[in-house]
């Protein structure tokens, strides 16, 4: 289904029956609702997945209009109200994790639990944020110049280097998703949702009163540290570190990720 908002049009995939609190999945950069298909097909809980603007079938209505993290939070909130959903178990991976934290900070009463995979609270130092934003602007230009070349190079990112060994079929599906995007929309998404554009959310995270589940792959040293830093901030948080996985745990170690979901929601 599609829901058109003032600044974006969101594509939403949902279970036919939402008779209990659903798990809402948010994918990472270059992903889509298809990134969660395998996980969603193997859980008993009702679920929802959304294409983040600029990805898959979700679009920015005007590529030249300003759009911020808060705009996505507001549009997601309105979408949930239209679907008559009052509570969610929110699960976000990487970029989707940052959007999940941002949404939870603005609409905490909507959150039953928060599962964040390989993500962070943003960048604290203003100068470091500016440096990162400039880097992402350069990447967005490369997307607009040649999406095929960008997706090929993106697959060689050290965060993803063992994915094909661990889940060949899932990795091939992921490559297909990456190639399917509209290059102007994807480039705009990176400009919009760059971590350099994101507010630093440490203070908000400290105030969360719902269960927080932090998931990291054992090979992803940088994000294990991010997870441990978050763990120290909130007594409601717990961290899972998964063997034989790096950045994308739900793809590289699907059974372990499903075990976590089963422990939490069954």
Spans of features found by a protein language model:
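Gly/Ala-rich beta-loop-alpha elbow adjacent to hydrolase catalytic centers
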Residues: 92-96, 100
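Conserved serine/cysteine hydrolase catalytic core
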Residues: 179-228
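Conserved HGGG/HGGXW glycine-rich cap/lid loop of the alpha/beta-hydrolase fold
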Residues: 8-60
């Amino acid at each position: 289904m599609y829901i058109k908002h003032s600044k974006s049009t969101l594509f939403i995939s949902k279970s036919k029956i939402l008779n209990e609190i659903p798990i809402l999945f948010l994918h990472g950069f270059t992903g889509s609702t298809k990134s969660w298909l395998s996980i969603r097909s193997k859980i008993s809980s009702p679920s929802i997945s959304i294409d983040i603007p600029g990805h898959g079938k979700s679009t920015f209505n005007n590529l030249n209009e300003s759009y911020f993290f808060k705009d996505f939070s507001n549009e997601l909130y309105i979408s949930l109200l239209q679907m008559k959903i009052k509570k969610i178990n929110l699960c976000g991976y990487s970029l989707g994790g940052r959007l999940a934290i941002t949404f939870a900070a603005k609409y905490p009463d909507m959150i039953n639990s928060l599962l964040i995979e390989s993500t962070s609270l943003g960048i604290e130092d203003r100068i470091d944020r500016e440096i990162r934003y400039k880097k992402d602007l350069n990447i967005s230009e490369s997307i607009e110049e040649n999406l095929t070349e960008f997706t090929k190079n993106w697959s060689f990112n050290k965060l993803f280097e063992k994915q094909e060994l661990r889940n060949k079929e899932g990795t091939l599906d992921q490559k297909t998703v990456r190639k399917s995007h509209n290059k102007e929309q994807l480039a705009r998404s990176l400009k919009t949702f760059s971590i350099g554009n994101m507010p630093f959310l440490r203070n908000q995270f400290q105030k969360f009163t719902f269960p927080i589940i932090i998931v990291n792959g054992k090979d992803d040293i940088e994000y294990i540290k991010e997870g441990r830093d978050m763990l120290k901030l909130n007594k409601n948080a717990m961290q899972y570190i998964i063997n034989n996985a790096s950045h994308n745990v739900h793809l590289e170690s699907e059974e372990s990720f499903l075990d976590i979901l089963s422990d939490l929601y069954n």
